[in-house]
Every structure is written in structure tokens, then in C-alpha cells.
Amino acid sequence: AAEKEGVTNFPIHIKLDTGMHRLGFAPHDVPELIARLKRQTSVIPRSVFSHLAGSDGDQFDSFTRKQIETFEKASEELQSAFPHKILRHICNTAGIQRYPGAQFEMVRLGLGLYGVDPYTNQMLHNVSTLKTTILQIRDVPQEDSVGYSRKGRLNRDSRIAAIPIGYADGLNRRLGNGNAYCLVNGQKAPYVGNICMDVCMIDVTDIDCREGDKVVIFGDALPVTVLSDVLGTIPYEILTSVSNRVKRIYYQD
């Protein structure tokens, strides 16, 4: 594309496959890559990078060290062929923490930007909160059920609140039926019955609350890692599942 536009020395970023086998040039392709780059003037390498496959797991330490070693050798080979400085980066959030010697000229902080440590699965400093408000509260007798397929069964007469958030907003259906909870006025309110598309129900029997009160799905007091642990997944999935129809508000200190 650069050649067709008559552009010269357009900076590009070169990805190396050091073991994740997703994208990138294999290390043994580097000599041919250098030769092709040398035969043209449209683009020049600005940076070279790779991705660590298991930097957040102790069991993968030997593999991670091998990846770093492979990357270092291949990037040195590329650098030696060009007079200008080529930036190197391979560390993700866990890599930054666990392999400081592999930070090179740049790093790529991913999940850490959102205050989550993928190595310990603990919070650093939370920066995101998903919240809603109570839409309606009703008294439901023990013998009745709540939600679709009558999945929400009660062990006592209960106060059930409906909140306007559902799986179309990114609230996973597997959190329903008491598998997880949200916070109402700082107290745990379990999800009752199936999570619906636009609404879900929570048990507020023992909570002093009223319609319009704030409900925290995840945030400072309820880390996103709690939900990811329940679902057997990673915090990334929870955060990226929040749909576009959920209003975003950005704060700047």
C-alpha cells in the first residue's frame, strides 16, 4: 500500500512468533524478511514485538524464558541489519511484573490499566465500576417463584428487587440463580432466578433499601475478579463483555 501511494520510509511494526503461534514471522524467517526490507524503500521497521503466552503462570516459566530468549536473538538480528534504532517490546502486564529484564524499550500494559494483576488475580487499584439502580421492589411469598422457567426458588418470604441490567448489557447468565451477588448499599444481594435480557432480580430481604438506590455489579468493594472466578474465566472477558448500550462516564483526577 505504501509503495502504491509513493510513500517512502513509512514506519512499520514487525511481529515475531516466539511460541504463541497466533500471528507473526517465525524466527527462521527473519533473514528473508531483512532481505525483502532491504530491497525496497517504501517501509522501514520502527519496532519489533512478540507476545508472551503464559507469563502469568509459574508453571510456564521455562517456556516464557525461552520465548524471551528467542525474541531477543531475533530482534538483535533485525536490529543489526539497520542503522536506526528499532524499539523492542514483548512484556504484557504479568511480564512487566515478573520479568523486569525483558522490558526492553517498551512494554504493553493491558489488564493492569484496569487495576487487575493477572498473576495473582488480585486488584491493584480499581479504575472501573459497573453500576445500576433499583427499578422496583416487591414482596414475594415463599411458595412463589421468580423469573423465567420458575428457576428462582425462595426459602422464605422475600423482598425481591428488579434492576435494569441483563445479559444484553453483558451480565453473564451463569451469574444467576444465586451463583453470584451484587452490592446494594454495601451489602450482598444474590441474583435470584435466571438473568433476563434487560433486567435481573436480586434478593434484598435483609437490606435496607428503596427504589432508586445504587446497585454495584462490580467495582471497588466487589472486584471484577470475584465475578471472573465464579465464571471460571478471566477478568478481560468480564470487562470486554459490557455492551455498547451501557453508558460510559469517564472521570479524570
Predicted feature residues:
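Active-site loop/helix belt of alpha/beta enzymes
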Residues: 2-11, 18-133, 137-141
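Conserved beta-strand segments that form the floor/walls of ligand-binding pockets within enzyme
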Residues: 13-15, 47, 108, 162, ...
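C-terminal accessory subdomain/extension
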Residues: 139-253
